[in-house]
Amino acid sequence: MKLLPSVVLKLFLAAVLSALVTGESLERLRRGLAAGTSNPDPPTVSTDQLLPLGGGRDRKVRDLQEADLDLLRVTLSSKPQALATPNKEEHGKRKKKGKGLGKKRDPCLRKYKDFCIHGECKYVKELRAPSCICHPGYHGERCHGLSLPVENRLYTYDHTTILAVVAVVLSSVCLLVIVGLLMFRYHRRGGYDVENEEKVKLGMTNSH
């Protein structure tokens, strides 16, 4: 029964010592975390120097501290990579966005700049092909054909018939004028001949 107070006292002292040691180790670990940005690998602390030898409880505390140190090393080594990967992802997204903006440009400005000869190019997204809006007087896929003006057949027919009628009328008028002149000359010549014959007859009678 006298041994029980001494055993309890020893256990209490061991617990106090372990608490002090763990407090110092945690303080050092916090300092290491504060300096972890400049030096990602924290200095290794030997648990043999921190904890006194002896007892299964001290060994358990030592194992827990080593496990905590390993976890801290893993977190410190993984934090810079975790910080670096989002930057890479953001940079990749920016590049993809830049490529997307380039794809949205009008292909008629660069690729199909000289596609339409006599017209304006217009890219049809549904067909994924360019089309041309031709200037007046041109036709074709690339506005390369010259379209001649088409005359109205009815108009040309009326025009030719009018010209033919005018020509016939003018020719008939000319013929009538010529016939009239010939008839006038013939009648005048016939009257002159009759007068001459009468004069000849009168002269012959006077001579008898």
Swiss-Prot record:
Propeptide position ranges: 20-62, 149-208
Transmembrane segments: 161-184
Residue intervals on the Cytoplasmic side: 185-208
Signal sequence annotation: 1-19
InterPro entries xrefs: EGF-like_dom
UniProt site positions, description: Plays a critical role in diphtheria toxin binding and toxin sensitivity: 141
GO MF annotation terms: epidermal growth factor receptor binding; growth factor activity; heparin binding; receptor ligand activity; transmembrane receptor protein tyrosine kinase activator activity
Region annotation (Disordered) ranges: 33-56, 82-104
Annotated ranges, domain EGF-like: 104-144
Example GO biological process: ERBB2-EGFR signaling pathway
Residue pairs linked by disulfide bridges in the UniProt entry: 108-121, 116-132, 134-143
Keywords assigned: Cell membrane, Disulfide bond, EGF-like domain, Glycoprotein, Growth factor, Heparin-binding, Membrane, Receptor, Secreted, Signal, Transmembrane, Transmembrane helix
Gene3D superfamilies: Laminin (2.10.25.10)
Function as written in the Swiss-Prot or TrEMBL entry: Growth factor that mediates its effects via EGFR, ERBB2 and ERBB4. Required for normal cardiac valve formation and normal heart function. Promotes smooth muscle cell proliferation. May be involved in macrophage-mediated cellular proliferation. It is mitogenic for fibroblasts, but not endothelial cells. It is able to bind EGF receptor/EGFR with higher affinity than EGF itself and is a far more potent mitogen for smooth muscle cells than EGF. Also acts as a diphtheria toxin receptor.
Protein name: Proheparin-binding EGF-like growth factor
